[in-house]
């Protein structure tokens, strides 16, 4: 009887641990937050003349048809915005590689680099926006550490 109670306690404890870890890991997954991007959203960054577009500053990057190593080439991603039906990804405990793979699987174009937006104000030069594809904006703290596939 005592052994049965001990075994039952261990089983209940293990099930509790599995449930707790399951809840933790399911809540730590990223989620897409839909926002509408328009002129007023751009103006939230300040006067629209402050944003300057610098075309084709991205480095050339190797491309493999079967797959590619995003993880090695992505640093400090904070936000991804896509067009008028925007996807916003905030920096946190998520895997940027998995997010980009999911964006690709859902038909978003992240295959070409069009240029970089940056602030003219010197104090804000660290806030940069990488344009990937037609409408994809990725805000990153360090542009020098980021290389994208550049296809035309």
From Swiss-Prot:
Q: Mark the transmembrane ranges.
A: 7-27
Source taxon at top rank: Archaea
Classify the protein's membrane topology as the record does: Single-pass membrane protein
Chief subcellular location equals membrane
* Swiss-Prot/TrEMBL keywords: Membrane, Transmembrane, Transmembrane helix
Q: Where in the cell is it found?
A: Membrane
Which Gene Ontology terms of cellular component type are present? Answer: membrane
Q: This chain belongs to which protein, by name?
A: Uncharacterized protein MJ1483
Origin organism lineage:
Archaea, Methanobacteriati, Methanobacteriota, Methanomada group, Methanococci
């Amino acid at each position: 009887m005592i052994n049965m109670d001990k075994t039952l306690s261990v089983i209940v404890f293990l099930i509790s641990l599995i449930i707790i870890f399951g809840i933790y890991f399911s809540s730590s997954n990223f989620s897409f937050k839909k926002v509408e991007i328009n002129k007023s959203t751009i103006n939230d960054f300040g006067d629209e003349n402050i944003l300057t577009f610098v075309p084709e500053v991205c480095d050339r990057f190797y491309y493999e048809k079967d797959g590619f190593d995003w993880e090695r080439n992505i640093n400090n991603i904070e936000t991804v915005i896509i067009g008028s039906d925007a996807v916003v990804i905030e920096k946190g405990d998520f895997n940027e590689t998995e997010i980009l793979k999911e964006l690709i699987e859902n038909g978003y174009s992240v295959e070409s680099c069009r240029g970089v937006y940056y602030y003219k104000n010197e104090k804000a030069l660290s806030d940069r926006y990488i344009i990937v594809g037609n409408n994809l904006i990725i805000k990153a703290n360090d542009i020098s550490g980021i290389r994208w596939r550049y296809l035309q």
